[in-house]
Amino acid sequence: MKKLSVALLVMLLAVSFVFANGAKEEAAPASDVFHVGIVTGTVSQSEDDLRGAEALIAEYGAVKDGGIIQHVTYPDNFMDEQETTIAVIVGLADDPLMKAVVVNQAVPGTTEAFRQIKEKRPDILCFAGESHEDIPVISTTADLVCNNDFVARGYLIIRTAHELGCDTFVHISFPRHMSYETMSRRVAIMKAACDEFGMKFVLETAPDPTSDVGVAGAQQYILEKVPAWIEQYGKNSAFFCTNDAHTEPLLKQLLQYGG
């Protein structure tokens, strides 16, 4: 889903430039040349995002090779290195051919980065994918904000779990994610949906991969806790986590122990 979101954003951008240039009868050759900045996490924090950027490079080429995609990554510990995150994003505006910057996921600091980009280069379009900052806030600087339909997903995920025969839904997250308005609202919807379908809703907490324990520590916690959770809640339980780094160890243990 994330790969598709990034790809659609850039395809939309490319088409818009083609039509814009086609409308100019006497357009200079240089007007057809533009670059697109793609900002993602690293493979350890959000592999899907990074692979999506690689797919775009494979299709449209990297700037260093004469293509249009300039891909950069923000730090794994982006919560503590917000200034670095901002600098990485804003640095893309130094390229005179840069016409759009897509940040996916739009982690904290993206709003400020877009503000600085607009100050120095108002011609650059700023796109935010899966915003970690409140949408009304990031919308003040972004030209387009794209998020999953978290309202519908809150209901549909529970309904699907019910249709699969689950009697318990275990939601795994941590305080940083739960502070996001989109995620807290989705949890409220999930709770209401569980009530509707007669399911038990459980909140479990796991370490934040951006904290001192890092990705490895967070994943180890999931590996160790899942067997106990399955024993506690039963094999008819559905498990859901809000962080990419938690997903792989969670799936691994569910395949081994059930659930």
Identify the residue ranges that each predicted region occupies.
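Extracytoplasmic "Venus flytrap"
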Residues: 32-86, 102-108
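Solvent-exposed loop/turn segments at secondary-structure junctions
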Residues: 42-45, 106-110, 131-136, 175-179, ...
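Flexible loop/hinge segments that line or gate small-molecule binding clefts
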Residues: 117-151
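An alpha-beta-alpha
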Residues: 53, 150-204
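Loop/turn elements at helix/coil->beta-strand transitions in domains of secreted/extracellular proteins
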Residues: 32-34, 65, 96-100, 120-125, ...
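Short beta-strand elements in bilobed, periplasmic/extracellular small-molecule ligand-binding domains
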Residues: 60-81, 170, 191-215
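Short, low-complexity disordered leader/linker segments with a strong preference
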Residues: 1-34
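Hydrophobic alpha-helical
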Residues: 100-126, 190, 210-259
